Amino acid sequence: MTVIRKKHPLIKMINHSFIDLPAPSNISSWWNFGSLLSLCLAVQILTGLFLAMHYTSDTSTAFSSVAHICRDVNYGWLIRYMHANGASMFFICLFLHVGRGVYYGSYNMIETWNMGIILLFAVMATAFMGYVLPWGQMSFWGATVITNLLSAIPYIGTTLVEWIWGGFSVDKATLTRFFAFHFILPFIITALVLVHLLFLHETGSNNPTGLNSDSDKIPFHPYYTIKDLLGVIILLMVFMILALFFPDILGDPDNYTPANPLNTPPHIKPEWYFLFAYAILRSIPNKLGGVLALILSILILALMPLLHTSKQRTLTFRPITQTMYWILVADLFILTWIGGQPVEYPFIIIGQTASIAYFAIIVILMPIAGMIENNILNLD
């Protein structure tokens, strides 16, 4: 077996990536989320494939085809709820994975980090288009509002929006193309994940101390395969409790009403995992400014390596920046809450304050805290 594992061209690649891969001996459970994201992606592709066998991407039948899946297809309700809640689990793992990267300074592996940001954008685009497919009220109005934001782009905006819609409003052409893109993007994401791993294995994994771990490596299998397996079991338990007992807890009741272009819901909002960015978008009264802030709320991650002022890589031994980090996490929770609230006092001012705090902590306060810590520790 060892001979095949080390000699066969294809198995050799798998061996170097998942079996004999040298890994730091001290990486914690925060490093489990990469494998959990792979599991989420696999679940989404499989459940999505079975849903696509029964779904019809036509405005007149899309809503009823989803109802048909839940009522008439064998275990269709389970496949549908696994797919819907799988997206939520995917984003929970994504946010924790990115949060780990920020906390432990993994952004210093620039190629891996930038590929991760591209992946984040791709997953967000896929999830947005998937939310449109059931063709409920929130699907239709969410698609209308979010795609309409592109009209803020000077000169080409209106043309671009009509080009994406395939007409003068969100209609049959929009739904069909969103289904096509929603189907193909997960496979593109899978290819990008392999590139992400390729870049990661060029440098090797980071670790909680942020120090070079070349002198103390252990093989990935069996140590981290077993450790990842524990994470997988916990994730699947949470996932199945969510899908079987509380399938609609993270959804919007409005999406159980078929799309009606003549009736606008009182509060148009995206899925919970976009609410923080939606709150930042709404906090700026100007349309173009809001769109730029929305894009920057994610793209600001690309500036992380440039904003790193500390002589230490991780936040493990940096209490001042640690405090800033946890304030940032709390701020993101506030933004998520505000994104789901109506646009009225006091939510408007809270959203604007939280949005300013979000950018200020990342761009100003954390770099300053890093310099202060350098001075305290005489690292200059």
UniProtKB/Swiss-Prot annotation:
* Residues annotated as transmembrane: 33-53, 77-98, 113-133, 178-198, 226-246, 288-308, 320-340, 347-367
Question: What remark does the entry make about the cofactor?
Answer: Binds 2 heme b groups non-covalently.
Stored SUPFAM superfamilies: a domain/subunit of cytochrome bc1 complex (Ubiquinol-cytochrome c reductase) (SSF81648), Transmembrane di-heme cytochromes (SSF81342)
Q: Name one GO molecular function term.
A: metal ion binding
Binding site residues for heme b b566: 97, 196
Keyword Cell division appears in the UniProt entry: no
Q: Any miscellaneous information on file?
A: Heme 1 (or BL or b562) is low-potential and absorbs at about 562 nm, and heme 2 (or BH or b566) is high-potential and absorbs at about 566 nm.
**Oligomer and partners:** The cytochrome bc1 complex contains 11 subunits: 3 respiratory subunits (MT-CYB, CYC1 and UQCRFS1), 2 core proteins (UQCRC1 and UQCRC2) and 6 low-molecular weight proteins (UQCRH/QCR6, UQCRB/QCR7, UQCRQ/QCR8, UQCR10/QCR9, UQCR11/QCR10 and a cleavage product of UQCRFS1). This cytochrome bc1 complex then forms a dimer.
The name this protein goes by in its record: Cytochrome b
Instruction: Tell me what organism the protein belongs to.
Output: Alexandromys kikuchii (Taiwan vole)
